[in-house]
């Protein structure tokens, strides 16, 4: 039980964003954070990660971050994937059609940017440049340059646009003119250099609802921590939503 806003709240789970939240500016989980995670779990509070990264890439990094064995559940790819350690259940939903992804890329083809599709712990890009190298290094995830015509014969979880921070406003402005008569999509800025497209049914809240059902936990019984636009919905819908400030 914790005391917030004049009432006691029975917290059953903590769901934490990774980049800019769980990880320090050096890209690690600090010993103090690990200690607090252990104390929470000793009280029966579950720990989950809710992130734009794909589940597979997160799982490969848990040991490096020093939290292997401390995570109970993962909401990945912005809510399109879930993995529950207790039941060993994995689920993916609402991918983007390959034809839609191609049309999005065409919409931005004259701009200074690159693209990435995260899948199976790998970032797949249509070309090799400083942008995909930067993202792969920052996320500690390998990347491969592939033929998107072949890759996009099947639906994919989401599309990431990578750009310079100073070009993000141009990317956002260009997004306002994208339209597809055949497919629906939503998009948002997820970092200073990342802009993402996904199915409009995908959100961290939707992923949380799906995975919390397995533990009979309501959204109002969790605390969330996040720092970016894709954390906004879970911050609003959680029992307590904590917004991380950048100093």
PLM region spans:
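Short, acidic loop-to-helix structural element flanking the phosphoryl-transfer center
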Residues: 27-43, 93-102, 199-213, 220-221, ...
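Residue-level detector of anion-binding/catalytic polar loops
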Residues: 46, 114, 218, 240-241
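Hydrophobic/aromatic beta-strand patches that form the interior of the parallel beta-sheet core
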Residues: 48, 75, 223-225, 242
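Short, well-ordered alpha-helix to beta-strand connector turns
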Residues: 11, 71, 156-157, 238
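Non-catalytic pre-domain segments flanking phosphatase-related domains
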Residues: 1-18, 35-38, 42
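Asp-based phosphoryl-transfer active-site loop
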Residues: 10-27, 235
């Amino acid at each position: 039980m914790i005391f917030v806003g004049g009432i006691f709240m029975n917290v059953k789970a903590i769901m934490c964003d990774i980049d800019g939240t769980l990880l320090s500016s050096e890209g690690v989980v600090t010993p103090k954070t690990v200690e607090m995670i252990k104390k929470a779990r000793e009280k029966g509070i579950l720990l989950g990660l809710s992130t734009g990264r794909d589940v597979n890439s997160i799982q490969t990094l848990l040991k490096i971050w020093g939290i292997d064995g401390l995570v109970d559940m993962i909401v990945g790819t912005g809510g399109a994937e879930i993995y529950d350690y207790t039941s060993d259940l994995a689920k993916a939903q609402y991918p983007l059609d390959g034809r839609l992804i191609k049309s999005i890329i065409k919409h931005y083809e004259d701009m200074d940017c690159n693209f990435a599709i995260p899948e199976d712990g790998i970032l797949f890009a249509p070309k090799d440049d400083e942008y995909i190298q930067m993202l792969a290094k920052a996320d500690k995830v390998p990347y491969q340059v592939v033929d998107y015509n072949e890759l996009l014969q099947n639906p994919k979880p989401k599309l990431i646009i990578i750009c310079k921070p100073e070009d993000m406003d141009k990317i956002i402005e260009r997004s306002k003119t994208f339209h597809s008569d055949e497919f629906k999509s939503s998009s948002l800025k997820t970092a200073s250099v990342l802009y993402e497209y996904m199915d409009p049914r995908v959100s961290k809240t939707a992923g949380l609802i799906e995975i919390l059902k397995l533990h009979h936990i309501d959204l109002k019984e969790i605390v969330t921590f996040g720092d970016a636009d894709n954390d906004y919905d879970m911050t609003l819908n959680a029992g307590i939503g904590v917004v991380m400030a950048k100093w």
